[in-house]
Structures are given as structure tokens and as C-alpha cells.
Amino acid sequence: IQSFCFTTSINRISEAKILLKSLREHHSQPIFIHCDWFSQLVIERLGYKDLIINPVINEKYLKNIVEKHTKNKYDILEQIHHCRSDYILAKLRCLKGAMMMFENTLFLDTDVIVLDDLQENFTTKVCLSPAHFPNSIRHFGFEYGFYNAGYVFCANRGFPSFWIDRFLKD
């Protein structure tokens, strides 16, 4: 793993601080972060080295995503799963930004806590985290998918653009 990346904003800054602390306990690789200006201030005060902070997330940025790309397209996703489409696209853009700087990266959602060294010998250029469904709702995998993007290992520079294209056009 050459780098890590994640997105955060004021509503997830507590999670982001825990993610950063747990990452730095086990890893020294650069961390590419898309965030809002407030999160940038908080993160910079933590004093961690090798952070690449890109404060692009703001109301105008998010509103632009909705108006130009996702308006009404993902209403059901947002209502049922409380998963904002504007943040999903921001996450994909973060992955793309990290891949423009590094040969590979591991994207992590801010609710991930790193408990050990994550260095793995990935056998594919893209690795998605599996979604977990208890036996009683295992069939949900067919409806919602068997993978989520809580973590994404990427070593293919074209993949983020492909994923963004699929997200916007499918």
C-alpha cells in the first residue's frame, strides 16, 4: 500500500480523527484527504505528517454535484440507506485524486478503525470490501449488492474514472 485516502466533513470529523490516529499507529504512508475547511483546521492541528489535504468539500461543491449529476437519481438510496449521493461522488473523486499521485491507494470510510498493519499482498488491481448481511437478510445482497465501498484498494489509474462514469450514467 503506497497511500491511504478518505473524505470527511464537519459531521464526520470525530470519526476521521479516530481513523487518522489508528492509521498512524500502524502506517506511515501518505494520506490523501478530501474535506471541508473546518475539518482541514482540525486535522492540521493533530500534527500528523504526510497528509495531503484538499479542502474541496463545501455546500457549493455538494450542491453542484446534486444539480449537475445526481438530482433525483438516487432518492431511494438516500431515503432507505441515508447514503448521500453527493458524498458518494466526493468519495470517488477522492479516490481518483489519490490515484493521480500514487501507484495505489487504500480508500477507507471514516468509520473504519485500523487495529493492525493493513499491508496485504493484494492479488488484484481493485479490491472492494464485502458487505455483511446476517443470515436472516442474506437475500439483501441480491438487491443491494454483495460489496460496499467501506474500503477500496485500487492499483488501476483508470478505475476511479470508470466508477465515476458508471455512477453518473447507470
Question: Residues of each region from the PLM?
Answer:
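Glycosyltransferase catalytic domains, chiefly GT-A lineage
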Residues: 1-170
